[in-house]
C-alpha cells in the first residue's frame, strides 16, 4: 500500500508573526506538522497543492522548505495563485525541474497507479487555467503508462462547488478536464486545494475532492466570502491494488478565530 499526504494553502509570510485574517499561518502549519508526526503517519509521498506562501518572497520559500525538511526526499509540488513559479522553483531546485516561470508539474508512479500534478496558475490572477497542453499531457501519460488507476493533483478544483464567490475564482476551462474525466475511467481521484475546506464531487468515474488549508478556513456554506473558526487539516490518500481511499484529518480544535474579510473580496 502507498500512502500520500496532501498539504495545501500554507500561506506563509516572511514575517514569522504575520497573520492572514487573524490566523498565524506559520504557527498553524507547525501545529499540523506536529500532529502528523505524533500520529505516526509515514507517508511514501507528500504533495503540496499550492499557495506555499502568501507574500511570494524568496525568504518565505526558504522557510517553507525548512519546515518541510522531513519530507524533502518525497515531496511533489504544484503552484497556487499565491505562488511565484520562478521563486518556488528556485527554493526547491532539487525537487522541481525546468527553468524560470515555466509550468510546474510532476509525475510519479506508486503500486501501479500514476499520480500527476497539474499547474493551474495564471500569473497575476486569482482564478486558474489548465490549458489544452496539460489535458493532452494527461491523456498521453495515461496512454503510455497504462496504469491501474490515476490520481490528479492541482490547486484550483475543476468543478463548481455551489459556493458563488469561490466558483468565480475557479478554473476557467474546467469543462475540458471534465470531458477527460468522463472519457477516461482510470482517473479515479482529483485532489485540489484553493478553497480552504473539504468537499467531494463526482465527475464521470472520478471523485473530485478539496482539502482544508493548514491555516485559514473558508465557509463552505456562504455564497460570499466568509471565514470560519475550524481546525486546520490535511488529506491522506491510500492506494492499494485497485482501491483508492481518501480521508481528511483535522486537528482536534481551532485555536484561533479569523477576522472576517472586507465586503469587496
Predicted regions and their residues:
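N-terminal active-site segment of His-dependent metallophosphoesterases
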Residues: 1-63
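Active-site-proximal beta-strand elements of phosphoester/diester hydrolases
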Residues: 2-14, 112-122, 151-153, 206-212, ...
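Active-site neighborhood of phospho(di)ester-bond hydrolases with catalytic His/Asp-centered motifs
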Residues: 6-8, 45-51, 75-81, 119, ...
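Short glycine-enriched, charge-decorated loop/helix-capping segments at active-site entrances
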Residues: 18-24, 94, 124, 163-169, ...
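Extended active-site neighborhood of metal-dependent phosphoesterases/phosphodiesterases
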Residues: 57-144, 173-186, 204, 212, ...
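A short C-terminal boundary segment appended to hydrolase-like catalytic domains
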Residues: 235-265
Amino acid at each position: 500500500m502507498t500512502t500520500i499526504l496532501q498539504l495545501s494553502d500554507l500561506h506563509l509570510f516572511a514575517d514569522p508573526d504575520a497573520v492572514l485574517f487573524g490566523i498565524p499561518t506559520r504557527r498553524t502549519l507547525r501545529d499540523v506538522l506536529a500532529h502528523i508526526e505524533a500520529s505516526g503517519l509515514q507517508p511514501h509521498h507528500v504533495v503540496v497543492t499550492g499557495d506555499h506562501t502568501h507574500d511570494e518572497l524568496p525568504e518565505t520559500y526558504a522557510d517553507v522548505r525548512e519546515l518541510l525538511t522531513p519530507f524533502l526526499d518525497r515531496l511533489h509540488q504544484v503552484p497556487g495563485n499565491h505562488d511565484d513559479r520562478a521563486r518556488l522553483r528556485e527554493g526547491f531546485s532539487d525537487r522541481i525541474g525546468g527553468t524560470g516561470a515555466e509550468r510546474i508539474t510532476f509525475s510519479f508512479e506508486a503500486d501501479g497507479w500514476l499520480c500527476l500534478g497539474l499547474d493551474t496558475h495564471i500569473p497575476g490572477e486569482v482564478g486558474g487555467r489548465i490549458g489544452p497542453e496539460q489535458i493532452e499531457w494527461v491523456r498521453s501519460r495515461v496512454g503510455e503508462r497504462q496504469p491501474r488507476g490515476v490520481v490528479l493533483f492541482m490547486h484550483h478544483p475543476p468543478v463548481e462547488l455551489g459556493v458563488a464567490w469561490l466558483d468565480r475564482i475557479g478554473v476557467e476551462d474546467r469543462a475540458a478536464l471534465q470531458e477527460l474525466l468522463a472519457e477516461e475511467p482510470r482517473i479515479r481521484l482529483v485532489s485540489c486545494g484553493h478553497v480552504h475546506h473539504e468537499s467531494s464531487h463526482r465527475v464521470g468515474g472520478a471523485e473530485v475532492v478539496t482539502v482544508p488549508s493548514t491555516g485559514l478556513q473558508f465557509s463552505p456554506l456562504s455564497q460570499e466570502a466568509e471565514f470560519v473558526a475550524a481546525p486546520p487539516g490535511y488529506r491522506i490518500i491510500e492506494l492499494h491494488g485497485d482501491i483508492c481511499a481518501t480521508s481528511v484529518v483535522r486537528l482536534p480544535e481551532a485555536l484561533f478565530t479569523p477576522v472576517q474579510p472586507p465586503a469587496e473580496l
